């Protein structure tokens, strides 16, 4: 193996290390990996980087961004071995994309506000992707996105051609309507429609969040944290009072829940 260790490494060193790991005399595990086998790794590393951002942990962010870069380098190396493209092609593609998407910086287009920039981007994306209708633009939203995020993007694209409520009240009314339809499906034991109606409720809730300029992913993220914190306090309180949560009546647990809710002011 022809590799010299040194004090500080750069991106080119990362690419070289990945090549060594994938070589016949490299690492058996790395050699066996395919795009699909490390797909979940890519997602996991990305979410860990996002968590570092959310917790404002810069040391962790530096580490997690490195893990994300490793995934990029691995996927590029897999294709480099097949002769389809390599990491330089990846860099070339994104550089060209950035230049095309910023004609107000690299060209003579006037876009001196964020609104103008975003409008230009939409026009450029539709042109470069040969999208002639807004339906094509909506279909271009990745199906692999988390569903709340995908819902938001679909709604945003539909709104750009006027297919939208006038204000949040219309979105709220639709949410209440969908909740009633879900309630009816449950009461009628209409198992076939329950999933569909629940999906409509979630989609409508995302629409309300969009009108309120609330990131639905972040809102649900915070709700999960709030529930976890409150549940932990309920469990602690139950233990202090000798209450077995597994056998205690729901009314007792609900009372503990309300007590914790009042003590924490939420």
Describe each model-derived feature in a short phrase:
Residues 1-64, 70-198, 202-266:
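Flexible "arm" and connector segments at domain edges
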